[in-house]
Amino acid sequence: MDVIIENRKVRFNYFIIQEFDAGIVLIGSEVKSLRQRKVSIAEAYVTEKNMELWLCNLHISEYNHASTKNHNPTRPRKLLLRKKQIYKISGNIKNDGFTVVPLSLYFNEKGLAKAKIVIVKGKKLHDKRETIKTRDWNREKSRVLRGN
């Protein structure tokens, strides 16, 4: 599994409820830009339209060597999932407080582009502070244990 990009802020800003692996419908110039790692998922999110899931605000830069028919960098891209998974995710999208965002993009063993999408719930400020405290405490523990 060749990870292209990972959105590490998701783990800090949200509680992760459930993870899914989804295929992405892309065109050729988008795949070539992905292989060059010219992509940003910081503002990306998943929406549901007509019982299909779409990845919005995923910015894949235009491929420099493509012909005049290059892709739109922020166009919505269809996600490929099983029907059961689509029902589960779309039900959570409709619930208040839940969001679906991409955690990472990667190429699988067959060379296909995949997105790891997660159902998340937003953290409050005190939860974020608690995360920082536990991370610092774990770092300090490992330093002390290495020192002995």
UniProtKB/Swiss-Prot annotation:
It is found in: Cytoplasm. GO terms for biological process: trans-translation. PROSITE patterns: SSRP (PS01317). It comes from the Bacteria. One of its GO terms (molecular function) is RNA binding. Coiled coil: none annotated. Pfam families: SmpB. GO terms for cellular component: cytosol. This is SsrA-binding protein. It comes from Ehrlichia canis (strain Jake). The lineage of its organism: Bacteria, Pseudomonadati, Pseudomonadota, Alphaproteobacteria, Rickettsiales. The gene is smpB.
